[in-house]
C-alpha cells in the first residue's frame, strides 16, 4: 500500500476503535462494570470460536496502576510530618551501616534496599499494620531481609532499641549489645516474628502462617478477630522456587489473610532482575494465573494529568513497550535524554510530554514513592475477600542516595560514602546536624515532645501498638513423664515396624491430659499405604 492509503487506513481504524470505546462507555454507564466484563468475555469467546487466539490478553493488564484516579481514596495522613519522619528513619538506617563500615572491621550492610522500600513501609506502618489488642489478634509483619536497617531505625525512634544497640549493627556480642544483620526470632525474639533472610523463606513462611491462622479461624479456635500476614519481598527474591512454588496453596485455601508486598526496584544483588523484560508484568501473569488478587502501583500522581489527555493510548503503548533495562537507564539519564528516547519520532506523544519540563521529567516519581497511590493499594489489599493479594510496587534502588547510587547496578553493594555524599544526603533529608556530625554519620533523634515524635507514637497507638513484634505469651506445657513410653523403652523380643511404634506413641500422647489437646495429626495420603 502507498503512504496515502496507509494513512487513510490508520485514520479509519482509529475512528473504529474510538467508536468501540464509546460503545463500551455507554454500556458501563447504562448497566455497570459487571456487564462490561460479561460483554468482553462474550467477545473474547466469539474471537476464540473464530480461531483468533488472544495469548496476551488474559493474564496481563496495561503497564499502569491498577486503581484509577477516580477510585483513589483521599490520603488520611499528614504528608509534611510523614516526610520528616521518613527522612529521619532513612538517615539513621544509612548511618547505622556507615558507622559499622567506619569501624574498619570489614563490616557492612545494605543501604539501598531500604532506601527503595522506605515509603511503602512507612505508609503500611502509619495506617495499616495493626498490633494485638483486646479484640484483635494482631498482624504479622515479615520484612524484606536487606531492609532490616530501616526497621531497626524506626524501632530506635520508637524507643524500643537503644543508641548503643543500633550503633553496634552486626556486632551483637559487644558489651552494650548489638543487632544482627537479618531478621530472626532467635536473635531478637521480641522484634522479629519469623526468619526471612534466606531467599525464598519469607514468602513460604508467610503463606504457611496464614494457612495455620485460617485453620484456627475456620474452627472457631481464635478468641479474637484474626489478623493479616504481611510479607515484604524483593522482586529478585520472587525467582526463588520456594516463593513462587507455594503461591497456589494460598489461592487454593482462599487465604485472604495474606498480603505480599513486592518491592520492584528492578535490581537484584548483582544487576537487573529482567533487563530485557518486565518483572512487574511477569509477576502479574504468574499471580493472576494462580488465582491471586493483583494490585499494581507503577506511576506517581504526576502522571495522572498525562493519562487524562492520552485519549488515543499512545503514551500507554509506549509504557507497555519499554523494558525494565530501559526504565533503569532513564533513572541515570538526564531529563532531555529520557525525553528523546521516550518520544522517538511520535509527534502525539511529544505533544503529551511537552506538559513536563526536562527537570520535571527527571524527577517524576515512581508509584512506590507516592503515598496516595500506596494508600489506595493497601486499602484495597486489606479489604480483599476470598483470595490472597499481591501488591507489585515499582521503586528505584538507592532512592534518595544521590546520583552515585540511585538506580545503578552497584547500589546493592553500597556500604560506604564520601564525606561530601554524607553531607549532601543529610542536607537533602533536612537532618539538623552539623557537617562534622554528618561526616561521622551520627544518629539523629528529635525531641520527644516534637510534632514528629508525637505523630510517630500516636499512629502506632491508633493501630494497637508497635510493629514488627513477636507475641510469645504462650502457656507453658509440661512434658509427659517417661513412664508414658515405657512400653517402648522396655523393649520387646521381636522386631517391630517403626511406623507401628510411631502410631502407638502418637496415640498415647493424644490421650495424655497435659498435651493431648494440643496435638493435631495431619495425615498425608501415604498414611493409608503405611496402615496409619
Description of each model-found segment:
Residues 6, 23-26, 74-82, 100-109, ...:
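Glycine- and acidic
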Residues 13-53:
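Amphipathic alpha-helical packing elements
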Residues 67, 72-93, 114, 129-132, ...:
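Non-catalytic terminal/interface segments that mediate subunit docking, oligomerization
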Residues 141-144, 257-265:
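Short internal beta-strands
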Residues 231-232, 260, 522:
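Residue-level marker for buried hydrophobic side chains located in beta-strands
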Residues 264-493:
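Long, well-ordered, tryptophan-enriched scaffold segments
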Amino acid at each position: 500500500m502507498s503512504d496515502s492509503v496507509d494513512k487513510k487506513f490508520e485514520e479509519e481504524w482509529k475512528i473504529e476503535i474510538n467508536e468501540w470505546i464509546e460503545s463500551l462507555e455507554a454500556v458501563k454507564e447504562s448497566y455497570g462494570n459487571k456487564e462490561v466484563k460479561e460483554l468482553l468475555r462474550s467477545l473474547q469467546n466469539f474471537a476464540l470460536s473464530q480461531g483468533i487466539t488472544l495469548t496476551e490478553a488474559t493474564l496481563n493488564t496495561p503497564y499502569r496502576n491498577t486503581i484509577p484516579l477516580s477510585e483513589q481514596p483521599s490520603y488520611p495522613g499528614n504528608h509534611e510530618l510523614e516526610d520528616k519522619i521518613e527522612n529521619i528513619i532513612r538517615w539513621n538506617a544509612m548511618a547505622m551501616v556507615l558507622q559499622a563500615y567506619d569501624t574498619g572491621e570489614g563490616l557492612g550492610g545494605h543501604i539501598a534496599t531500604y532506601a527503595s522500600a522506605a515509603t511503602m513501609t512507612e505508609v503500611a506502618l502509619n495506617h495499616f499494620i495493626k498490633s494485638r489488642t483486646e479484640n484483635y489478634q494482631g498482624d504479622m509483619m515479615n520484612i524484606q531481609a536487606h531492609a532490616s536497617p530501616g526497621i531497626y531505625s524506626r524501632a530506635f525512634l520508637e524507643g524500643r532499641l537503644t543508641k548503643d544497640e543500633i550503633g553496634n549493627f552486626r556486632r551483637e556480642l559487644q558489651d552494650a549489645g548489638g543487632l544482627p544483620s537479618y531478621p530472626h526470632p532467635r536473635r531478637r525474639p521480641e522484634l522479629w516474628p519469623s526468619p526471612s533472610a534466606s531467599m525464598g523463606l519469607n514468602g513460604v513462611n508467610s503463606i504457611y502462617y496464614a494457612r495455620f491462622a485460617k485453620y484456627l479461624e475456620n474452627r472457631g479456635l481464635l478468641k479474637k478477630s484474626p489478623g493479616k500476614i504481611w510479607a515484604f519481598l524483593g522482586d529478585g527474591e520472587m525467582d526463588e522456587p520456594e516463593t513462587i512454588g507455594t503461591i497456589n496453596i494460598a489461592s487454593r485455601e482462599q487465604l485472604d489473610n495474606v498480603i505480599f508486598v513486592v518491592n520492584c526496584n528492578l535490581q537484584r544483588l548483582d544487576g537487573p532482575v529482567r533487563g530485557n523484560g518486565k518483572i512487574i508484568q511477569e509477576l502479574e501473569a504468574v499471580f493472576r494465573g494462580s488465582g491471586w488478587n493483583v494490585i499494581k502501583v507503577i506511576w506517581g500522581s504526576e502522571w495522572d494529568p498525562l493519562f487524562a489527555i492520552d485519549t488515543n493510548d499512545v503514551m500507554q503503548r509506549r509504557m507497555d513497550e519499554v523494558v525494565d533495562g530501559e526504565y533503569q537507564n532513564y533513572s541515570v539519564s538526564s531529563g532531555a535524554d529520557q525525553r528523546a528516547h521516550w518520544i522517538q519520532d511520535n509527534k502525539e506523544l511529544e505533544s503529551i510530554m511537552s506538559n513536563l519540563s526536562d527537570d520535571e521529567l527527571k524527577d517524576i516519581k515512581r508509584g512506590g514513592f507516592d503515598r496516595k497511590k500506596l494508600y489506595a493499594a493497601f486499602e484495597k489489599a486489606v479489604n480483599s475477600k476470598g483470595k490472597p493479594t499481591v501488591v507489585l510496587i515499582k521503586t528505584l534502588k538507592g532512592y534518595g542516595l544521590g546520583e552515585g547510587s540511585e538506580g545503578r547496578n552497584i547500589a546493592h553493594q553500597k556500604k560506604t560514602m564520601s564525606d561530601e555524599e554524607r553531607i549532601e544526603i543529610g542536607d537533602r533529608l533536612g537532618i539538623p546536624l552539623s557537617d562534622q556530625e554528618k561526616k561521622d554519620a551520627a544518629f539523629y533523634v528529635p525531641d520527644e515532645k516534637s510534632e514528629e515524635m508525637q505523630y510517630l507514637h500516636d499512629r502506632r497507638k491508633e493501630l494497637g501498638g508497635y510493629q514488627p513484634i513477636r507475641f510469645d505469651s504462650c502457656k507453658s506445657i509440661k512434658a509427659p513423664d517417661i513412664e508414658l513410653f515405657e512400653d517402648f523403652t522396655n523393649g520387646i523380643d521381636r522386631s517391630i515396624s517403626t511406623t507401628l511404634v510411631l502410631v502407638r506413641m502418637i496415640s498415647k500422647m493424644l490421650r495424655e491430659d497435659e498435651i493431648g489437646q494440643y496435638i493435631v495429626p495431619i495425615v498425608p495420603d501415604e498414611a493409608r499405604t503405611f496402615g496409619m
